């Protein structure tokens, strides 16, 4: 049985994925887990770049969702991405962070996409 946090995370991933699909991206993989880290979404952008997406979803604005993606999290994402890329042909890549804050009254998502982050989103 899923927890409320898991439902919130899955909802945020759905919202983020739709944002990429609206921009003509293609979903390659989702919720990929390795011992070194996990990847929420992997998409191919309209320009052919493979994008590894970390999604952070919160209710209200008391906590900055993107701040949860720090250097350590980025390192784990890079390691997981390297494993996912093994054996695949060379392709340009980037790492994005999508911060989603749900309005506590309406539940409406506010989406911020940080593209090509290097050391986390701030």
From Swiss-Prot:
Family annotation (InterPro entries): Restrct_endonuc-II-like, tRNA_endonuc-like_dom_sf, UPF0102_YraN-like
GO MF annotations in UniProt: nucleic acid binding
Gene3D superfamilies, per database record: 3.40.1350.10
TM segment ranges: none
PANTHER family: UPF0102 PROTEIN YRAN (PTHR34039:SF1)
Sequence similarity: Belongs to the UPF0102 family.
Protein's recorded name: UPF0102 protein Cgl2031/cg2228
Organism: Corynebacterium glutamicum (strain ATCC 13032 / DSM 20300 / JCM 1318 / BCRC 11384 / CCUG 27702 / LMG 3730 / NBRC 12168 / NCIMB 10025 / NRRL B-2784 / 534)
């Amino acid at each position: 049985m899923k927890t409320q946090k898991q439902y919130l995370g899955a909802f945020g991933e759905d919202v983020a994925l739709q944002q990429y699909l609206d921009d003509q991206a293609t979903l390659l993989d989702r919720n990929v887990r390795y011992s070194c880290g996990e990847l929420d979404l992997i998409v191919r952008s309209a320009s052919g770049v493979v994008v590894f997406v970390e999604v952070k979803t919160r209710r209200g604005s008391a906590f900055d969702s993107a701040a949860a993606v720090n250097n350590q999290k980025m390192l784990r994402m890079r390691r997981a991405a390297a494993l996912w890329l093994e054996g695949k042909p060379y392709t340009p890549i980037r790492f994005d962070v999508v911060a989603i804050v749900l309005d506590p009254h309406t539940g409406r998502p506010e989406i911020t996409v940080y593209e090509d982050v290097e050391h986390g989103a701030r």
